[in-house]
């Protein structure tokens, strides 16, 4: 049964409406977004790029930029290693183009989802050393790779981590928490406890967008040049499901305005391949049409295909690449539908549908769509869901959660079950050995304190509209 919640925050909505020349209903919507001051409301309604936070506030951004400047000026080779989703591809694109603008000798690698798994690993580090790379920059990954970063250090590489994921931690016997940061030359992540950046809920692409601004400042490049990356940063923000408040709202608004006349040939080709050239692009198109086409490459072939589309400047070649990604996404949709059907059958046949935390084992499912299936199952059952598949190395899984269940913290309580894991309150990924599967299921459910109220679908209502509205 649904639970309805009607927001009841109070304010003089008529007065707010008069100040900003908006209706009292819109004023109530703003108040329900926890906006209390005139300045906050002004920024919410009319925020511009001048309202974005100072990029130099990101901890280690200046330090990292100084390191990169020295590497560029001495001709050292730099390699970018990103994630394979929309945020990872977008981060890689922004970082690559920004470093090129500064004169860097730079290339990129994107881990293969099946062969490499998520994030930087020993194989990628060894390959970089063999290729004569001096410096590795991660984007949208690396914060949970302390061992891998240490290994890179031992090979004499310089490593810089840019990421936005939660910082790995351990709870001590006395109840205190110790955070496990990688020993990189610079760690740029707004979720560090001592980072003075005012807003931590930015995606990986926005982190590197900010870093490139700092680098441009150091090289004396007009930072307005970095605005060419805004439509890419906006798409990543939406596709990585960042909250559309604070500066994210400004970035997405500006990105949507600019994408109508984008100069990124590959992005324009993707818009045309999906027949959106005559439409006003919205956040819906980012999240449900354009983004999934980019994601499809990382899921089914190689995310390098999507990155090469964004970097391509030949119109005909871009058209071919964009159409291929669009077709790939159609195939992914069909695979997802079959996977969702199999997941429901599994839960009902095993009786696990009654568990508080649902663990679905689909050994023959393509690992790349496990997260999508988990999301669909969460929407259907309104419970936290983990979907696990079999790979050559063992099991891999993705989880999607509900508001009442902090997925990353719960996984941290049973970290002995995993080979690797990481994530957010609402989503996570991991690898494990097959003989830990039942232990994983049992411990998750034994620890779960969820109640029937937590499983009720929650509908948040801002205001009951007058009939005349």
Question: Model regions: which residues?
Answer:
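A contiguous loop/helix-start segment that scaffolds small-molecule binding in enzyme catalytic cores
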Residues: 261-264, 447-469
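Non-catalytic nucleic-acid-binding/docking modules located in mid-to-C-terminal regions
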Residues: 6
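Hydrophobic helix-and-loop "lid/oligomerization" segment in the mid-to-C-terminal part
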Residues: 9-135, 155-156, 172-175, 183, ...
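Active-site cavity-forming subdomains of large catalytic enzyme subunits
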Residues: 126-205, 209-218, 228, 245
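Catalytic domains of riboflavin
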Residues: 1-3
